[in-house]
Structure formats: C-alpha cells, structure tokens
UniProtKB/Swiss-Prot annotation:
Pfam families given in the database record: Sec61_beta (PF03911)
Assembly, per entry: Component of the protein translocase complex. Heterotrimer consisting of alpha (SecY), beta (SecG) and gamma (SecE) subunits. Can form oligomers of the heterotrimer.
Record organism: Aeropyrum pernix (strain ATCC 700893 / DSM 11879 / JCM 9820 / NBRC 100138 / K1)
Superkingdom classification of source: Archaea
Protein name, entry field: Preprotein translocase subunit SecG
Length: 59
C-alpha cells in the first residue's frame, strides 16, 4: 500500500487570530431541555386561548 501524504492545513489569518471559530462549544448557565421548552410554549398558548374564550373583552 502506498502512503498518502495529507495536506497540511494552514490557518488563515482570520481563524489564527481567533476571530472565527466553527467548532467552539458554548455552555450556558441555564440548561433547559427541549421538551420543557415545547411544553411551556403549549401551556402558554393554552392559557392565552382560554383567556380569550372565558374572559370578556373590556370595551
């Protein structure tokens, strides 16, 4: 088998200066699962719909 030489990746000035990074992981302080976010959105929508149905509009 022949040995393949890999190209050396050269850092561009933008990425070398730290101005642009693609694979950076950011960990926020608040961690909420997507299930809770969707559930909260459905709950808020239901409360707003119930308020429109059961509470009279003030002229």
């Amino acid at each position: 088998m022949s040995v393949r030489r890999r190209r050396e990746r050269r850092a561009t000035p933008v990425t070398a200066a730290g101005l642009l990074s693609f694979y950076e992981e950011y960990e926020g302080k608040i961690k909420i699962s997507p299930t809770i976010v969707v559930g909260a959105a459905i709950l808020v929508s239901a409360v707003v719909a119930a308020a429109h149905i059961f509470l009279p509009a003030v002229p």
